[in-house]
Regions:
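Acidic, mature catalytic/reactive cores of soluble proteins
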Residues: 1-436
C-alpha cells in the first residue's frame, strides 16, 4: 500500500512522539504489503499509569492478541453484569436488549450504585454526557478504582429516578443528596463533583486496633480521600487481598461522606422538577415510611454562590426591544462552606416537608405576568439548550408550571396525611403567608 504523502512508517517512528491527547486514541505506523486474500490485524494499546513502576510491572506480562481478546471479553462481561440489574425476558429479544442498554446508558450518566462497607451508597462511573460532538460538555473521569466524573445536577438526577426500584439498597440517599443541594432561593448548583470521604482521628485510632495496616495510611486518611485513593493505598500496604478488602470496608463504613458541588453558570428553570420523581420512586417501594421521610429534620441547605439580580437591574432597553440580562451576581459568601448555618454557626437543618413547601412557594412566586409559565429568571432555560437565548427575551415555561402542579398536588396531599404539625423556619413561614 501507499504511505501517507511524504512519510514512511520507519521515518514516522523515529520522530519525537507525542504522549498526550484530548481523546482516548492514538496513531500507530506500520508498513506491510498484503497479497490477495491476506489480512493483517493491528493491535493498539494506550493508557495511563500513576507511576512508572506500574508500567514496568504491566509490561512484564505477555502482550499479544490473547491479551486484547481477554480485555474485550472482560469488557463484555462488565457491561452484561451491569445490565443484570434490569434483566428482562419477553417475547421480544430486541426489547429485552433495549432495557439493558438503556440502563447501561443511565449508569454512564447517573452512575452505577454500589454499597461499600455494607453502609455507604456509592455511585461509580457517573459523569457528563461528553459526546465528541458536544465538546462544551467537558468532563473528567479519574484514572482510579471506583472512578467518578463530574456531572450536571440534572444529568445525574434524571438518571437515578428509578434506582430505588432497581436497587432498593440506595434507600433515601438520592433524596438526601439532591435536597441537601437545594438552596434557600429554590435553586441549586449546576455541577456535582466526585465524592470524597473523611475519617475522624478517633475513628482511625479505634480501627487501628483491629486493622494495623491503617498506621501506614496516614498520608491518605489525613484529609478527604476518594474510594479509589483508599484502595490504591491498600494495594501498597495491605499484606493480602483479604486484609485489603476487610480494611477498605471498615474504613468506608466508619467514614463520613463529603459532597462537592460548584455553581457553574446560571440557574436552570427546571432542575428542581426531577426531585419529586425521587420521592415517588422511594414511596413506591416503601410507602409506609412516608411520615419519617417527610418529617425527619436531617436535611441541610446548600449556600448559594450567586444571587438572582433584581428586576430593575437586569431589564434593559435595546434597539431590538426590551431584554433581560445579567440574571445572577456573585455573593460575598461564594467561598463559604457546603451548608448554610444559623446565627450560632450551626448547620441549618430542615425536614423534607419544609423544603417541599418552600419549593412550592418560590416556584409559584416566579410565575410570569400571565400566571402561566415559570419565569427563566436565573438566566437559563430548561433542558433544551437551543433555547439559551429565551431568558433574555423574558422567556417562561409551561412545562415547569405543569411540574409545579404535580408538586403542589403531592405536597398538599402529604400535608393532609401527616398526623402532626412540623417545624418551619420563620422566614420560610413568612414567605408562604405573604403569598397566600
Amino acid at each position: 500500500g501507499r504511505d501517507f504523502p511524504g512519510w514512511r512508517a520507519g521515518k514516522a517512528r523515529r520522530q519525537k512522539q507525542v504522549w498526550q491527547n484530548q481523546f482516548p486514541c492514538s496513531f500507530y505506523a506500520l508498513r506491510r504489503t498484503l497479497e490477495p486474500n491476506q489480512k493483517c490485524s493491528l493491535f493498539e494499546m494506550y493508557g495511563y499509569v500513576e507511576e512508572r513502576a506500574d508500567l514496568v510491572q504491566y509490561c512484564r506480562e505477555p502482550i499479544g492478541p490473547q491479551l486484547f481478546a481477554d480485555a474485550f471479553r472482560e469488557a463484555r462481561v462488565l457491561t452484561d453484569t451491569i445490565g443484570k440489574r434490569v434483566e428482562t425476558h419477553t417475547a421480544n429479544p430486541i426489547f429485552d436488549a433495549y432495557c439493558s442498554y438503556t440502563y447501561l446508558d443511565n449508569c454512564l450518566r447517573g452512575g452505577f450504585p454500589l454499597l461499600l462497607g455494607g453502609k455507604q451508597v456509592f455511585y461509580a462511573f457517573s459523569r457528563k454526557h461528553g459526546d465528541l460532538e458536544r465538546d462544551y460538555n467537558y468532563f473528567t473521569v479519574k484514572p482510579e478504582y471506583y472512578s467518578q466524573g463530574n456531572g450536571n445536577f440534572r444529568d445525574i438526577n434524571q438518571n437515578r429516578r428509578c434506582d430505588v426500584s432497581l436497587s432498593p439498597f440506595v434507600g433515601r440517599s438520592n433524596i438526601d443528596l439532591f435536597f441537601d443541594l437545594l438552596q434557600l432561593d429554590g435553586y441549586n448548583p449546576l455541577q456535582i463533583e466526585p465524592e470524597t470521604f473523611v475519617l475522624a482521628q478517633e475513628e482511625q485510632s479505634a480501627l487501628a486496633q483491629d486493622c494495623p495496616v491503617i498506621h501506614g495510611l496516614s498520608g491518605v486518611l489525613s484529609s478527604g480521600f476518594s474510594a479509589g485513593q483508599l484502595w490504591r493505598a491498600l494495594e501498597r500496604n495491605a499484606a493480602s487481598p483479604k486484609e485489603r478488602e476487610l480494611t477498605f470496608a471498615k474504613i468506608i463504613a466508619a467514614a463520613k461522606k463529603q459532597i462537592h458541588a460548584s455553581f457553574g453558570e446560571g440557574y436552570w428553570s427546571d432542575h428542581w422538577s426531577y426531585d419529586l420523581d425521587l420521592i415517588e420512586d422511594y414511596l413506591t417501594v416503601w410507602p409506609d415510611r412516608e411520615e419519617k421521610l417527610l418529617c425527619d429534620e436531617t436535611l441541610t441547605w446548600y449556600p448559594a454562590r450567586a444571587g438572582i439580580t433584581e428586576r430593575c437591574a437586569r431589564y434593559r432597553e435595546t434597539p431590538n426591544g426590551l431584554r433581560q440580562y445579567n440574571a445572577t451576581y456573585p455573593l460575598e459568601n461564594s467561598t463559604a462552606g457546603t451548608v448554610e448555618v444559623d446565627a450560632q454557626g450551626n448547620p441549618l437543618r430542615s425536614c423534607l416537608m419544609e423544603k417541599l413547601v418552600l419549593l412550592c412557594a418560590i416556584k409559584y412566586a416566579t410565575l410570569d405576568a400571565y400566571a402561566m409559565g415559570i419565569e427563566m429568571e436565573g438566566g437559563k432555560p430548561g433542558w433544551y439548550d437551543a433555547l439559551n437565548g429565551l431568558p433574555g427575551l423574558f422567556g417562561s415555561s409551561m412545562a415547569e408550571s405543569c411540574e409545579l402542579a404535580r408538586l403542589l398536588e403531592y405536597t398538599i396531599s402529604a400535608l393532609e396525611r401527616l398526623p402532626h404539625p412540623f417545624a418551619m423556619h420563620r422566614e420560610i413561614r413568612a414567605l408562604v403567608d405573604e403569598l397566600s
